[in-house]
Design a protein with these regions (language model features):
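C-terminal "exit" segments of structured domains
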Residues: 5-6, 199-229
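Extracytoplasmic/secreted cell-surface and envelope-processing proteins
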Residues: 23-26, 68-71, 123, 138-143, ...
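VWA/integrin I-like adhesion module and closely mimicked acidic/polar interface patches used
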Residues: 136-199
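Von Willebrand factor
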Residues: 7-131, 138, 185-186
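Sec-exported extracytoplasmic/periplasmic mature domains
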Residues: 35, 39-43, 96, 112-120, ...
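Surface-exposed acidic, glycine-flexible loop patches that form ligand/cofactor-binding
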Residues: 2-8, 46-51, 114-128, 173-175
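Phosphate/oxyanion-binding active-site loops and adjacent basic polyanion-contact surfaces
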Residues: 23-34, 100-109, 156-162, 214, ...
């Protein structure tokens, strides 16, 4: 039998980032941590007698598809630490701008895109982790309709119920039920409250609505990630 302490985790992490006008702080935090991200996360995992065999990170950035032309920006998976430079360059290309005048953003659509990532199936133990940052409430998925970009329609759910079913029961997106984790940095508002109350394997850190998540730094985010793996 494999000893617990020798288990090696293959970790896929998808960072879902609100890149509307108020969110420059989080973009800078993620970029500044890129070089040491693997080492810092590995150190925190070692304290829990866990090891990372392979770490891949990708980004799904979002704005408001009802107000912004460039509403979703996706990267491929970058392997760490080898490709931290490419990851950092991608994050540096993200600009905090735009956002709908009505407040809500297209966060649930971005979460759906993240869930449909090309998740790893390799390794003794796997973790499929999504961490999402936003300081706004989400648009209802039911509102999307014809506004969903046609190229993305197959990966964006049309209702909160179907998104919930996919998280809890489905296998279409490739996330293993025992491996999936969701870490949310979002305000306690309608749209998020329903998700936090009903989704399993979900950790919520309440953010201040409209404040750009200024209260969070990468050290606390890394601690949360290590605890979720």
């Amino acid at each position: 039998m494999t000893d617990f302490q020798s288990l090696r985790y293959n970790v896929d992490l998808v960072m879902v980032i609100d890149v509307t006008g108020s969110m420059g702080h989080i973009i800078r935090e993620v970029r500044s941590a890129a070089i040491s991200f693997h080492d810092q996360l590995s150190a925190r995992m070692s304290e829990k007698n866990k090891r990372i065999a392979k770490l891949r990170v990708r980004v799904v950035a979002f704005r408001d598809m009802f107000a912004d032309q460039e509403c979703f920006i996706e990267s491929r998976f970058f392997e760490f630490p080898q490709e931290h430079g490419e990851f950092s360059a991608f994050v540096a290309s993200l600009k905090a701008k735009g956002g709908g005048g009505d407040g809500p953003e297209s966060a649930l659509e971005a979460l759906s895109l993240a869930m449909h990532s090309d998740w790893t199936k390799e390794g003794d133990k796997r973790r499929h982790v999504i961490v999402l940052w936003s300081d706004a409430r989400p648009h209802p998925l039911e509102k999307g309709g014809v506004n969903v970009p046609s190229a993305l329609a197959g990966r964006i759910h049309s209702s909160f119920g179907s998104l919930t079913d996919e998280w809890e029961l489905g296998q279409k997106c490739g996330m293993e039920r025992s491996s999936r984790r969701l870490v949310l940095y979002v305000p306690e508002v309608s749209g998020w409250n329903e998700l936090v109350e009903s989704w399993s394997q979900t950790i919520h850190f309440p953010s201040k609505a409209g404040k750009g998540l200024q209260e969070f730094e990468m050290n606390t985010i890394l601690d949360a990630l290590a605890n979720s793996i």
